[in-house]
Amino acid sequence: MALLGNFLCCLLVAWLCGPGLGVPLAPADRAPAVGQFWHVTDLHLDPTYHITDDRTKVCASSKGANASNPGPFGDVLCDSPYQLILSAFDFIKNSGQEASFMIWTGDSPPHVPVPELSTGTVIKVITNMTMTVQNLFPNLQVFPALGNHDYWPQDQLPIVTSKVYSAVADLWKPWLGEEAISTLKKGGFYSQKVASNPGLRIISLNTNLYYGPNIMTLNKTDPANQFEWLENTLNSSLWNKEKVYIIAHVPVGYLPYATDTPAIRQYYNEKLLDIFRRYSSVIAGQFYGHTHRDSLMVLSDKNGNPLNSVFVAPAVTPVKGVLQKETNNPGVRLFQYKPGDYTLLDMVQYYLNLTEANLKGESNWTLEYVLTQAYSVADLQPKSLYALVQQFATKDSKQFLKYYHYYFVSYDSSATCDQHCKTLQVCAIMNLDSMSYDDCLKQHL
């Protein structure tokens, strides 16, 4: 199946016959003192997706495997059809929620073998997704971050300018200023003040430079000088009394589903955490994607005192490997913050029950949970989340059972997490550096 032949089809999906939307369930009568922004991630468009009798030909992203139960909004062995992505953005547009901006943390192309893509195709996919967002939200400032699949070959994002960096810099000009465009072209990262919130700066990092499979950065102590740039930018924000939200694709810390596996190379992880700790008074939140799951982390200092709240958002794509039992329902989320100091107050997670949507032929995006209500916490501050995770660690914790259900975006209510699984989850949430993480594993495994 040729990927290139399907892009116009995606872009020309009739806007007039968009999917049906459910009524948003988030509280509508908010005080005007609360600001809001959306977070979407891991769209992973598969333009080849189509319903056909031959289940091996439904989508390129199944890599020849039989799609399990394909419908108009996708299949768990396939990346997102355009109709699924459009339904997510249509829901956001028609949700009735007022938002100041949106963050979009990368990965637009599908999971397909390297020979099935090219630099040109990757740029076309990112263009498609960017145009979709700009057409639906012409007046909303959007802050993108590049993902490891937003390049060809995948994962190999370079430390110098490239066709992809130049292309996205041009595509994202409506949202970014000249200085941001300049650093984006050079290294795939940038910082930008939020137009509607002048005291808030978004720092969009290219953490793909630190990703294990990226051979372009092997043995480089500061790829693209991003560490030096980050420290200078945070120091400037400190002096200018700005607050900062960090966004990126690949998160810091350890993967919660694997033993002793940092999401990025250990040296880079320790270096980033050191910078984040030193500027924790400036950083008001960190937001990532990449894992396709809903998880959180709390960055603490060397003495275990909580400093920063870290959120990893679930994907829009529902794709999983043939041998994987669990996957995620598609999800998007809304954060609430306090204007002025940009303290994070709450998070509202929405999702699409993919099985139900395919059966009914319409997308009923609905509320999954409101974080403070689900866990009975006051806000999203590091101390509040740290106390919550201490509850997760207790034996037979109902709070953790709830967390693990939401981890898969309510995909499978029968999913269980044994003691080993729980230890990996809790250690990853509370311990982002190698020393504290290893100590946690030794203590509990």
Curated annotation (Swiss-Prot):
Subunit structure: Monomer. Homodimer; homodimerizes following 2',3'-cGAMP-binding.
Family of the protein in this entry: Belongs to the acid sphingomyelinase family.
UniProt keyword list: Disulfide bond, Glycoprotein, Hydrolase, Metal-binding, Secreted, Signal, Zinc
Disulfide bonds: C59-C78, C417-C421, C427-C440
Required cofactor names: Zn(2+)
Bound cofactor: record note: Binds 2 Zn(2+) per subunit.
Top EC class of this enzyme: hydrolase
GO CC terms, sorted: extracellular region; extracellular space
Residues with glycosylation annotation: N66, N128, N219, N235, N353, N364
SUPFAM superfamilies documented for this protein: Metallo-dependent phosphatases
Signal peptide: 1-22
Record GO terms (molecular function): ATP hydrolysis activity; phosphoric diester hydrolase activity; zinc ion binding
Free-text activity regulation comment from the record: Requires micromolar levels of Zn(2+) for activity. Inhibited by millimolar levels of Zn(2+).
Organism in which the protein naturally occurs: Mus musculus
InterPro entries to which the protein is assigned, alphabetical: ASM-like_Pdiesterase_prd, ASM_C, ASMase/PPN1_MPP, Calcineurin-like_PHP_ApaH, Metallo-depent_PP-like
Functional description taken from the UniProt entry: Cyclic-nucleotide phosphodiesterase that acts as a negative regulator of innate immunity by mediating degradation of 2',3'-cGAMP, thereby inhibiting the cGAS-STING signaling. Specifically linearizes 2',3'-cGAMP into 2'5'-bond pGpA and further hydrolyzes pGpA to produce GpA. Also has in vitro nucleotide phosphodiesterase activity with nucleoside triphosphates, such as ATP. Has in vitro activity with p-nitrophenyl-TMP. Has lower activity with nucleoside diphosphates, and no activity with nucleoside monophosphates. Has in vitro activity with CDP-choline, giving rise to CMP and phosphocholine.
Protein's name according to its UniProt entry: Cyclic GMP-AMP phosphodiesterase SMPDL3A
Keyword Secreted in record: yes
Tissues expressed in: Detected in blood serum (at protein level).
EC number: 3.1.4.-, 3.6.1.15
Ligand binding (Zn(2+) 2): D107, N148, H249, H290
Main location: secreted
Modified how: N-glycosylated.
Catalysis: reaction(s): 2',3'-cGAMP + H2O = 5'-pGpA(2'-5') + H(+); 5'-pGpA(2'-5') + H2O = 5'-GpA(2'-5') + phosphate; a ribonucleoside 5'-triphosphate + H2O = a ribonucleoside 5'-diphosphate + phosphate + H(+); ATP + H2O = ADP + phosphate + H(+)
GO terms under biological process: negative regulation of cGAS/STING signaling pathway; nucleoside triphosphate catabolic process
